[in-house]
């Protein structure tokens, strides 16, 4: 199969060559602080994660219409025409400059799939309105120099490339050729390290009755049913004694970072310790990060047989009540120390990972949308016009994300969105993964 082509475009010195070198299988481009070092379009075989492609680096463009500038524009235009996807790069340190605005208009007129890549984001970064004004519907923050943000870039690339050649190929067998990163998280002393030792049949990780033995995230490469898996044991998450509101203020930043990089998170619960708000906070954080999640109740062998049924009923009630946005999360009851039901956990992880990668064709989506919205109409507005959701498309996977077009998106209530999400989850068999909707106003005022 012919490799997909990704073209890097932007004004001088935004870091195109640095990203080119970062993604290239071999270093090709000269990198220097002097603007305009790259004057030809350069090609290399690129790779991000398991996805390989042809990468093009283009000259930095500015508004000066001299003869050199015209030739640089010709080089860039050819690279844009060749591209299946454009990464339009800007510099977070300098912010949006007039040249960025001119070049974004130049790029958008070719109607190619595009991602706005904000480079040099070594610290936390929030997109302000100036970035949205450039007109791109996908935006990510990275540091090409330090390699941060590349997982988000990978997700956006996979979502944006033509679905019949990239997305469908990956989803048909999402584990093959890929490394499934599974993070084992939870409160201290829930049995995370014991669980991993039982899986790999090796005392690889230090365990004991003391809470908090694991101080940092430990990665273990492993094979399960011909799948390459990276198991990541994390420090137990606990709140600082003075903090009561937000999981983001937990002291275990290493664990939080591991969750951000995970494909699937196993949330380990101690069956002998009541389900606490902290457990639900961790689960909510995983869902908000867009990761898939499997909940595992450990030490099940220590629960009295006469109490197990009531325990399960209460447990499911708490999960469904506090995490209604991800109905159908897999829940398994195990004994890590006795190796009871531990393989079922991995099977659940493989299954939910495939759901997390699920791609639905646009035709099937809109057939479902028409039926579902007609079954439950939105109310009439002033003037007798009804709010309608007329069309939708899937914009990415990991997690499944959808764009819906409406004549009046501001009037669509949260309860109606929940109705659509829950109906979609059932119709397309997508239990237990985050499903994200964004609404866009249709340009046709009569739709």
From Swiss-Prot:
The keyword GTP-binding applies. GTP 2 binds at residues 186-193, 233-237, 298-301. GO terms for molecular function: GTP binding. GTP 1 binds at residues 10-17, 57-61, 119-122. Residues 358-443 form the KH-like domain. InterPro entries: G_ENGA, GTP-bd, GTPase_Der, KH_dom-like, KH_dom-like_a/b, P-loop_NTPase, Small_GTP-bd. GO terms for biological process: ribosome biogenesis. Pfam families: KH_dom-like (PF14714), MMR_HSR1 (PF01926). Residues 4-165, 180-357 form the EngA-type G domain. Belongs to the TRAFAC class TrmE-Era-EngA-EngB-Septin-like GTPase superfamily. EngA (Der) GTPase family. GTPase that plays an essential role in the late steps of ribosome biogenesis. Associates with the 50S ribosomal subunit. This is GTPase Der. It comes from Rickettsia rickettsii (strain Sheila Smith). The gene is der.
């Amino acid at each position: 199969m012919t490799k997909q082509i990704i073209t890097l475009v932007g004004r001088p010195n935004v870091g195109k060559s640095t990203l080119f070198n970062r993604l290239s299988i071999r270093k090709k481009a000269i990198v220097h602080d002097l603007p305009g070092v790259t004057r030809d379009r350069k090609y290399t075989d690129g790779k991000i994660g398991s996805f390989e492609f042809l990468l093009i680096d283009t000259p930095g463009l500015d508004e000066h219409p001299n003869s050199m500038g015209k030739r640089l524009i010709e080089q860039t235009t050819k690279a844009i025409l060749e591209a299946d996807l454009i990464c339009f790069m800007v510099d977070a340190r300098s912010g949006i400059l007039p040249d960025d605005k001119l070049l974004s208009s130049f790029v958008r007129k070719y109607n190619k799939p595009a991602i706005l890549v904000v480079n040099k984001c070594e610290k936390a970064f929030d997109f302000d309105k100036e970035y949205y004004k450039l007109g791109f519907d996908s935006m990510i923050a990275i540091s090409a120099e330090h390699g941060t943000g590349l997982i988000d870039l990978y997700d956006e690339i996979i979502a944006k490339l033509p679905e019949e050649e990239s997305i469908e190929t990956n989803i048909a067998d999402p584990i093959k050729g890929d490394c499934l990163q599974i993070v084992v998280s939870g409160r201290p002393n829930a049995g995370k390290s014991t669980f991993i030792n039982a899986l790999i049949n090796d005392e690889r990780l230090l365990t004991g009755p003391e809470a908090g033995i694991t101080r940092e995230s430990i990665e273990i490469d492993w094979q399960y049913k011909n799948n390459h898996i990276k198991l990541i044991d994390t420090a137990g998450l606990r709140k600082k004694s003075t903090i009561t509101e937000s999981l983001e203020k937990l002291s275990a930043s290493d664990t939080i970072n591991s969750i951000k990089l995970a494909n699937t998170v196993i949330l380990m619960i101690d069956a002998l310790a009541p389900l606490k708000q902290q457990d639900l906070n961790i689960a909510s954080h995983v869902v908000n990060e867009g990761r898939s999640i499997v909940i595992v109740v450990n030490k099940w062998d220590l629960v009295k047989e006469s109490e197990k049924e009531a325990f399960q009923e209460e447990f499911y009630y708490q999960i469904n009540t506090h995490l209604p946005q991800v109905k159908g999360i897999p829940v398994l009851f195990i004994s890590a120390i006795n190796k009871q039901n531990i393989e079922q956990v991995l099977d659940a992880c493989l299954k939910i990972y495939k759901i997390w990668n699920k791609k639905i064709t646009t035709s099937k989506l809109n057939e479902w949308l028409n039926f579902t919205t007609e079954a439950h109409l939105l109310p009439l507005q002033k003037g007798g016009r009804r709010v309608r959701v007329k069309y939708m498309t899937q914009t990415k996977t990991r997690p499944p994300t959808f764009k819906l077009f409406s004549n009046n998106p501001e009037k669509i209530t949260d309860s109606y969105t929940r109705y659509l999400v829950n109906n979609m989850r059932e119709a397309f068999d997508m239990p237990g993964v985050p499903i994200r909707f964004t609404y866009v106003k249709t340009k046709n005022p009569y739709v």
